[in-house]
A protein has these predicted regions:
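Helix-rich C-terminal "cap"/substrate-channel and partner-interaction subdomain
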Residues: 355-463, 534, 538, 545-546
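An anion/pyrophosphate-binding glycine-rich loop and adjacent beta-alpha core
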Residues: 121, 128-129, 138-166, 170, ...
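Extreme N-terminal leader/targeting segments of oxidoreductases
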Residues: 1-7, 25-28, 510, 514, ...
């Protein structure tokens, strides 16, 4: 039996489900989502669910002063020539439209994460006091029945704003948690996926898992469907439009080696991110862009395997910025502003030593002391709590150096210098604490939240702790180039009829930039919306131009 749809979407993360819902609400009667994995949601379901949108409605309602022009100025200040102005405009203009779309078509309601600074807040157009990071309010999964267990990620009945990283205490009262459990309410990335999934099902979107896209079907140079690998064998699915939302290629070692600018040693997103959509687009002559870049992040791995088969890891964005911690390379030396945002730190890990011709900061080691544990806690453990078994503990810095194979004398000298400067509230080596973003994790505990001391404190209270830090990525940022509405372009810059892309599979409109918390999902949501609508609007055309 011939299977045919108006629109086929490959991938079920925020980009894919938004695209499917956009197509269905635009008038497409037959829409299907095919997901490679056995679980829905992709990397979105594993995420915090935060979305970075300049001049967003929740911020405006909270009295935050922001504008389209400020958002564009901010992105331009960070571009380094890698952001195309027309795509930056599409991103900034599309953000509020995405919020409106969710309000009109789903139960998802986005709320401001108050105070969360942009990742480079002192740049022109940046917001040191926050206002661009918004997150879904709790979403009820009641009525989703078996679909609830088919979404990746762990159940989280909390908000980013309730966590220490989001400015909260990290403690939700037991009676509140009980109420949320009874109502089947969830937060973070699963809330975003659950809300989108319910809306897709309501609009009759067909959802199938364990269905991997292999190659695109062409009819006289027009994309006319896709060949799938399914539990029932290979199937040819015909469609007026195909939207690629398959995620990045961080789990494919060959693609990582051939394209990325430096090491990516331990990916943390959905394990199905092996470049399927990229390969499909390459086979039919798609133009590629931004292939060197990823949404970089240092991570600390810990034992265990997630439900989707990926390894457990922590971004440690909070711990790296707290007083009483530093990060050193294999030579026992600091090499960066540890409190900087995780994407920017990718550059520090990719620094090539010209004499050794080696990435000397890979791996790195986070070192902290008992005073940090007592004041702040770490890795999900509250202040004064016992550190997990996978965190190395030693009574002296020399003992810690021996465990990690670091030169003890160099480590001691590094800590001595850092301690002296920290007591004076300065970091002349890497300017840690000078940015509002650096100070955000520790500001709530500081006498002066605007002082660098919010991010600086000596390491001197035994025992000392350490953990290996690898360079990872939340996803890659390179792939087929698109126009501002998600249409995939060929090597000559012309539209490939019938093919669209959204999310991490595409050449990111953000270039090398990570504007603030939620920038990945902003691209996913905005281009999912664009691609889904364009796929319906373009139906019946045999050729297209920008």
């Amino acid at each position: 039996m011939r299977q045919a749809y108006d629109v086929v979407v490959l991938g079920s993360g925020a980009a894919g489900l938004t695209a499917a819902l956009a197509a269905a609400t635009q008038g497409a009667e037959r829409v299907a989502v095919f997901e490679k994995a056995g679980l829905l949601g992709g990397t979105t379901a594993l995420s915090g669910g935060t979305i970075w949108i300049p001049a967003n409605q929740p911020a405006r309602e909270a009295g935050v002063e922001d504008s389209r022009e400020q958002g564009l100025e901010y992105l331009a200040s960070l571009s380094n020539g890698m952001i195309l102005p027309e795509l930056a405009e599409a991103l900034v203009d599309g953000g509020p439209r995405f919020v409106d779309f969710l309000n009109a078509n789903t139960e998802i309601r986005l709320r401001l994460v108050r105070g969360y600074p942009d990742y480079h807040p002192e740049h022109p157009g940046g917001l040191p006091g926050g206002g661009r990071s918004i997150e879904p309010a709790l979403v009820s999964f009641a009525g989703l029945e078996e679909w609830t267990d088919r979404i990746a990620g762990d159940v989280r009945r909390s908000l980013i704003a309730e966590t220490p990283l989001g400015g909260g205490t990290g403690v939700v009262p037991p009676d509140v948690l009980a109420e949320r459990e009874e109502a089947k309410q969830e937060g973070l990335g699963r809330a975003l996926i659950g809300g989108l999934l319910r809306a897709c099902l309501k609009h009759g979107v067909h959802i199938a898992t364990r269905s991997r896209g292999l190659r695109l079907l062409l009819d006289d140079h027009v994309v006319a469907g896709v060949e799938l690998e399914t539990p029932d064998g290979h199937q040819s699915i015909h469609a007026d439009a195909v939207i690629l939302a398959t995620g990045g290629f961080e789990y494919d070692p060959d693609l990582v080696r051939d394209f990325l600018r430096g090491p990516l040693t331990k990916p943390v997103g959905a394990p199905t991110d092996t470049g399927d959509g990229l390969r499909m687009a390459m086979r039919i002559g798609a133009q590629l862009g931004n292939m060197r870049e990823a949404w970089w992040s240092p991570i600390i791995s810990y034992p265990g395997v997630r439900r989707d088969g990926g390894g457990n890891a922590l971004l440690s964005a909070r711990e790296r910025a707290l007083p009483g911690s530093i990060m050193v390379n294999r030579y026992g030396r600091r090499f960066c502003n540890e409190a900087a945002n995780y994407n920017a730190l990718g550059g520090a890990f990719h620094r090539l030593d010209e004499s050794r011709l080696d990435f000397v900061n890979v791996p790195a080691y986070m070192i902290f002391d008992q005073s940090m544990v007592d004041r702040f806690g770490a890795f999900g453990v509250g202040p004064g709590g016992e550190m997990p078994d996978w965190v190395t503990r030693a009574q002296t810095l020399d003992d810690l150096a021996e465990v990690f194979g670091l030169p003890a004398a160099e480590l001691r000298a590094t800590v001595d210098r850092f301690n002296e400067n920290a007591r004076n509230g300065v970091d002349p080596d890497f300017a840690r604490g000078e940015s509002a973003y650096d100070r955000w994790p520790g500001a709530g505990h500081a006498a002066d939240p605007d002082s660098p001391r919010s991010a600086l404190g000596p390491l001197e209270a035994a025992p000392f702790y350490g953990a290996e830090v690898a360079i990872s990525a939340l996803g890659t940022k390179g792939g087929p180039r698109t126009d501002r509405e998600g249409r995939v372009l060929d090597v000559d810059g012309d539209v490939i009829p019938g093919l669209y892309a959204a999310g991490n599979v595409m050449a990111s409109p953000a270039g090398m930039v990570y504007g603030g918390a939620g920038a990945t999902l902003a691209v996913a949501g905005v281009w999912g919306l664009y691609a889904g609508r364009a796929a319906v609007q373009d139906r019946g055309r045999t050729a297209r131009t920008d």
